[in-house]
Amino acid sequence: LHLSIRRQRQMCIRDRIEVITMPGKGEFKLTGNMGDVMKESASIAVSYIKSVTEKGRYKVDTEYFQKHAFHLHIPEGATPKDGPSAGVTMATAMLSAVTGIPVRADVAMTGELTLRGRVLPIGGLKEKLLASKTAGITNVFVPEDNQADVEELDAEITDGMNIIYVNNVKEVFAQALMH
């Protein structure tokens, strides 16, 4: 999954995940034919972003979440989508939308997210890396617990790729957001 800024306060992940904020009262809307596990991942990402911004690490007004509504959409709504592996990407897109800090256009990321920000391993890594490489994205954040999976892949898949292993989503924020 690839992250690139489309407009201020609106993020798009290679036309796969979009997050916008707008005036509101804290509402959170999900669209794009997501399954239950993916919806749970989005909910975890929202809770995590609220917790890290309320602690003052990022410059977000403490009342921001009460004064804004959020909409997360995954295009191609006719296509069912599910699984936890977009959690890190959703959290990164949400933090970018909330702070206005753009995400580097040359990165992709994958990983299940916990409420405490841990990045858990995912399946389908080969396909995700191939998709990134095909899209011309060679910097990919991958759960550290997937390192053995990467090492088992054919060199033709990983050659020319900068695979960045992470344990916590804060590592992704530090390297993927354009501070």
Regions found by a protein language model. Give the residues of each.
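Single conserved hydrophobic/aromatic residue that forms the stacking wall/gate
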Residues: 1-9, 13
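Peripheral, non-AAA+ core regions of ATP-driven protein-machinery
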Residues: 14-179
